[in-house]
From Swiss-Prot:
Protein name (database record): Solute carrier family 22 member 13
Alphabetized UniProt keyword annotations: Cell membrane, Glycoprotein, Membrane, Transmembrane, Transmembrane helix
Family to which this protein belongs: Belongs to the major facilitator (TC 2.A.1) superfamily. Organic cation transporter (TC 2.A.1.19) family.
Topology of this chain in the membrane: Multi-pass membrane protein
Main location group: membrane
Species of the source: Mus musculus (Mouse)
One BP annotation, GO: nicotinate transport
Database matches in Gene3D superfamilies: MFS general substrate transporter like domains (1.20.1250.20)
Reaction(s) catalysed (UniProt annotation): nicotinate(in) + a carboxylate(out) = nicotinate(out) + a carboxylate(in); orotate(out) + a carboxylate(in) = orotate(in) + a carboxylate(out)
Compartment(s) of residence: Apical cell membrane
SUPFAM superfamilies in alphabetical order: MFS general substrate transporter (SSF103473)
Alphabetical list of InterPro entries matching this protein: MFS_dom, MFS_sugar_transport-like, MFS_trans_sf, Sugar_transporter_CS
Glycosylation sites: N57, N61, N74, N104
């Protein structure tokens, strides 16, 4: 009887069918750039000051500048304060008394804020995300990142339950509806709620696209195909720069960025299901039809005899999260990878969310960030082949951290230098993230691989949630976030020196393979009973084609 991997080898690892699928899976990744990073351009800094009703309603014949002078104090730089106003004088006060600043006690704004009249409506302006509400800008990003975590937890099982195709269709539809609804909210609280739901859907289709590619593309091209699909996020960031530059009204920007999602209805007719998943559900005939279709598209038709021999592959049971900490070697690997994934997310998103803080034009910086991320992802594949996984991971993380540390000592009047350092950091962080996916999968043995990937991915999402909150520490000292974003990747990178190299090695199946440091034997299709006992569990071999991929 032929196993699925043998049949797919006859179909071809990366023929025309898989190329088309990779392109299709790249579209949601392309659109994800807007959903994740679009808000950065909706809350740009702009001048504002307290709206002082008593001056506006007074009968004094004063110019706008004079009204501002008697109602708003100046800061140390001589500019009007953004969050303070003079306490309103008594009704009996004369204009002379007011102009002489006899009533110069200050208070917080109590009637809202005034913004430049010639500026398009921004999210910050409409919902007054300033002064005591300014932290909501960063908090909303944490809410979105929390939605990504919840979405991974929810849609992972859904993807395994109803299939990759219907799950992806549902996630794309949910993304389009919630993102479009966000453009019409009347309160910031509703905006946050919809952004959370949008993030859960985003996490779902980012997961489903990777799973579909991994289950259709053969092993010789799988890494390149996944990287190619993920690189569309970088392309989306570049397009976002131009879109945000041309559309400054936040509601119109939201609608414009969402509209392409609604055009993906054609996925209903062209998106294939995963034959691996169909086999796992006992739907063998449907799987055979799909595999034969792919073979015909690739110009490599299969014989009916070979298809009729198609059976699910036998694998052993997977462990749970606690099993990762029972074995000394697995415990060390797991703890280091938790740190690596946490820092990967922390550094990558910190640079992306601070795109406007490096001194140069935010739109130009965003364009450059997207442009360097794409080669960063592809060059990481070359680095892994030349330097090995361990040293590639160590070097990219350390380089990203060093860039942050250097930025601390660069004067603010050298924005070009700061931006160049940030761009190098962005390149390194994108490469580090890509390497982590490959390296982590190779470090965990088969019996515990998916559980390990799921656990470290949780900490990656936690890193994303914490990132905007760390950025809030700049209100105490501007260097605090930079020190954190710089020191943690250096530390995590150095920890990678304690990990084994996996370049050129066959994936390990069992704990015995791991302990002996030998490639897994080709005759093994399932873990031995003693391996499961070493994990503190025993179980008989069962049939399982597709393991859960929650993250």
């Amino acid at each position: 009887m032929a196993q699925f991997a043998q049949v797919m080898a006859e179909v071809g690892d990366f023929g025309r069918f898989q190329v088309r699928l990779t392109i299709l899976m790249g579209i949601p990744n392309f659109l994800a750039a807007f959903f994740i990073f679009g808000q950065v351009f909706m809350v740009l800094d702009e001048a504002h000051h307290c709206s002082v009703s008593w001056v506006k309603n007074h009968t004094f014949n004063l110019s706008a500048a004079e009204q501002l002078a008697i109602s708003i104090p100046n800061d140390t730089a001589g500019r009007p304060e953004s969050c303070l106003m003079f306490r309103p004088p008594p009704d009996s006060a004369s204009l002379e008394d007011i102009l002489s600043h006899r009533f110069n006690e200050t208070q917080a704004c109590d009637s809202g804020w005034d913004y430049p009249e010639n500026r398009p409506q921004s999210l910050k302006k409409e919902f007054d995300l300033v002064c005591d509400r300014k932290n909501l800008k960063k908090t909303s990003q944490s809410v979105f990142m929390a939605g990504l975590l919840v979405g991974a937890l929810v849609f992972g099982p859904v993807c395994d339950w109803i299939g990759r195709r219907p799950s992806l269709l549902m996630q794309v539809l949910l993304s389009g509806i919630t993102s479009m609804a966000t453009a019409f909210v009347s309160s910031f609280e509703l905006y946050l709620a919809l952004r959370f739901v949008l993030a859960t859907a985003n996490a779902g289709f980012l997961l489903s696209t990777n799973v579909l590619i991994s289950e259709w593309v053969g092993p010789s091209w799988r890494t390149q195909a996944v990287v190619l699909a993920q690189s569309n996020v970088a392309l989306g960031q570049m397009v976002l720069a131009g879109l945000a530059y041309g559309v400054r009204n936040w509601r119109l920007l939201q609608i414009t960025g969402t509209a392409p999602v609604l055009l993906l209805f054609f996925y209903f007719w062209v998106l294939p299901e995963s034959p691996r998943w169909l086999l796992s559900q006992g739907r063998t005939e449907e799987a055979k039809q799909l595999v034969q279709k792919a073979a015909l598209v690739n110009g490599r038709p299969l014989s009916p005899e070979l298809l009729n021999q198609l059976v699910p592959e036998k694998t052993g049971p997977s462990g749970n999260a606690l099993d990762l900490f029972r074995h000394p070697h697995l415990r060390k690997v797991t703890l280091i990878l938790i740190a690596v994934w946490f820092v990967d997310s922390l550094v990558y998103y910190s640079l992306s969310f601070q795109v406007g803080d490096f001194g140069l034009d935010i739109y130009v910086t965003q364009l450059i960030f997207g442009a360097v991320e794409m080669p960063g992802r592809f060059l990481s594949v070359l680095m892994m082949e030349k330097l090995g996984r361990k040293w590639s991971q160590l070097c990219t993380l350390t380089l990203a951290g060093i860039m942050y540390i250097i930025i601390i000592f660069i004067p603010g009047d050298l924005p070009t230098v700061v931006t160049v350092l940030a761009v190098v950091g962005k390149f390194a962080s994108a490469a580090a993230f890509t390497i982590s996916y490959v390296y982590t999968a190779e470090l965990f043995p088969t019996i515990i691989r998916q559980t390990g990937m799921g656990l470290v991915s949780i900490f990656s999402r936690v890193g994303g949630i914490i990132t905007p909150l760390v950025m809030l520490l700049e209100q105490y000292h501007q260097a605090i976030p930079m020190v954190i974003f710089g020191s943690l990747p250096i530390g995590a990178g150095l920890l990678c020196a304690l990990l084994p190299e996996t370049r050129g090695q066959t994936l390990k199946d069992t704990l015995q393979d791991l302990e002996q440091g030998l490639p897994a034997g080709s005759h093994k299709t399932a873990p031995q009973r003693q391996d499961m006992e070493a994990l503190g569990r025993t179980s008989s071999v069962r049939v399982a084609v597709v393991k859960s991929s929650y993250f």
